[in-house]
Design a protein with these regions (language model features):
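Hydrophobic alpha-helical core bundles mediating ligand binding, dimerization, or RNAP-core interactions
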Residues: 12, 54, 103-106, 179
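Short, charged, low-complexity patches
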Residues: 95-99, 103, 168, 172
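Extended mid-to-C-terminal alpha-helical interaction segments
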Residues: 130-131, 135-182
Length: 182
C-alpha cells in the first residue's frame, strides 16, 4: 500500500478531530519501527556503527516519505536529533501531532538500533508546554523542556560508536547502492 504524504496528513487531521486521545501521536510514532521502512530502514539496521546509521538516516530520509525533516549533529558530548518543523501552513494542532509523532519515532528507531537500554537524556520542543505535557516524559522516557529554540532529542554522544544489534556491513554496502539508485 502506497500512501502519499498528503493522504497521511489528512488521516492524521481526521484522527485528531475524532479522538480526544492526546497520546495518539506518540503511539503512532512508537509503532513505526525501522523494519517498516523497507530498504531505508534495513540499511540503518545493517550499518556497522550507530554513527553510520545516523548518517544514512539523514542522507536517505526522502525514501521514508517524511512528514518532517530530520538532521543529526554532535554538540559537545551529545548526539542531537533535530526535528525541523517546516510545515507552517498546516493547522497548529496537526503540526503538534507531527512533532510528537516524529519525536516518538526517533526514540523508537534508536531503540530498534541499540536496544531498550538506549534512552534519550533530554527532549526539547519549540512549542509551549501543551496541556498533556506530563505525558511527554512518560512516553519519551526522558525529561522534556518546552519553549526551546528548536525541536531536538539528545543522547549521549558515546553511543555513536556502538554497533547496532543487526549490523552487517556487507548488507549495508549493498543496501546503500540500492538507496543511491532510488
Amino acid at each position: 500500500c502506497l500512501t502519499s504524504i498528503g493522504q497521511y496528513l489528512r488521516a492524521c487531521g481526521n484522527a485528531i478531530g475524532l479522538l480526544a486521545d492526546r497520546a495518539l501521536s506518540f503511539r503512532a510514532g512508537a509503532a513505526l519501527h525501522l523494519s517498516d521502512y523497507g530498504m531505508y530502514g534495513l540499511l540503518q539496521l545493517s550499518c556497522g556503527t550507530l554513527r553510520e546509521s545516523v548518517d544514512r538516516a539523514v542522507r536517505y530520509q526522502r525514501l521514508s516519505t517524511p512528514t518532517m525533516a530530520i538532521d543529526a549533529v554532535v554538540e559537545g558530548t551529545q548526539l542531537l536529533w533535530l526535528l525541523r518543523d517546516e510545515a507552517g501552513d498546516l493547522p497548529a494542532e496537526l503540526r503538534l501531532f507531527l512533532v510528537e509523532q516524529q519525536a516518538a519515532q526517533q526514540v523508537t528507531h534508536m531503540s530498534d538500533l541499540l536496544g531498550e537500554a538506549c534512552s534519550p537524556t533530554l527532549a526539547c520542543f519549540a512549542h509551549p508546554a501543551p496541556v498533556h505535557r506530563d505525558r511527554y516524559a512518560e512516553l519519551l522516557g526522558c525529561p522534556c523542556v518546552f519553549g526551546w529554540h528548536r525541536h531536538e532529542i539528545r543522547y549521549p554522544g558515546e553511543i555513536l560508536a556502538r554497533r547496532p544489534g543487526l549490523a552487517n556491513p556487507l548488507a549495508a554496502t549493498m543496501l546503500e547502492s540500492v538507496c543511491d539508485g532510488q
